[in-house]
């Protein structure tokens, strides 16, 4: 979608149109000030949308990463369960795996971000219907069993 930024984070670039209108009035004109403030707010909203699209893309990559690591952890658990008490003969560390504390830290950051957004919605009196959340895949459904 875009080039890679620092740290491998994809950069989202959207086309912008510059609009120059000669107003023929002074800066103190209420109409000119109103238009300028409107235009500035529109630009801020465009930048916010760009950041949100980039965040959504990062979340999709993050979801795939979590799913891959979850499958790998389940595979290792099945393998260890199959070894039984002979697991000491098959001790090999996985150096490429992130530490549990790091995964938990990311989970807490995501949870805090989502929780803050939900609190602000509740304070504004805006709540999402359960049907809408289910359509987006945001349900808190049961997790799969852990096999040993």
Curated annotation (Swiss-Prot):
Q: Which InterPro entries match?
A: Suppressor_APCD_1/2
Q: Which domain of life is it from?
A: Eukaryota
Transmembrane parts of this sequence: none
Please list where the region (Disordered) is annotated: 120-148
Q: Which PANTHER family match?
A: FI14130P, SUPPRESSOR APC DOMAIN-CONTAINING PROTEIN 1
What is the name attached to this protein's record?
Suppressor APC domain-containing protein 1
Query: What organism, scientifically named, is this protein from?
Result: Homo sapiens (Human)
């Amino acid at each position: 979608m875009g080039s890679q930024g620092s740290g491998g984070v994809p950069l989202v670039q959207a086309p912008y149109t510059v609009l120059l209108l000669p107003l023929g009035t002074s800066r103190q004109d209420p109409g000119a000030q109103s238009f300028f403030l409107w235009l500035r707010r529109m630009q801020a909203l465009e930048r916010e949308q760009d950041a949100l699209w980039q965040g959504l893309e990062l979340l999709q990559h993050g979801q795939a990463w979590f799913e891959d690591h979850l499958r790998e952890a389940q595979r290792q658990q099945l393998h260890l369960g199959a070894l039984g008490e002979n697991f000491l003969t098959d001790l090999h560390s996985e150096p490429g795996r992130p530490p549990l504390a790091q995964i938990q830290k990311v989970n807490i950051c995501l949870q805090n971000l989502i929780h803050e957004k939900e609190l602000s919605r509740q304070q504004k009196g805006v709540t999402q219907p359960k049907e809408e959340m289910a359509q987006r895949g945001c349900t808190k459904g049961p997790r799969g069993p852990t096999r040993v």
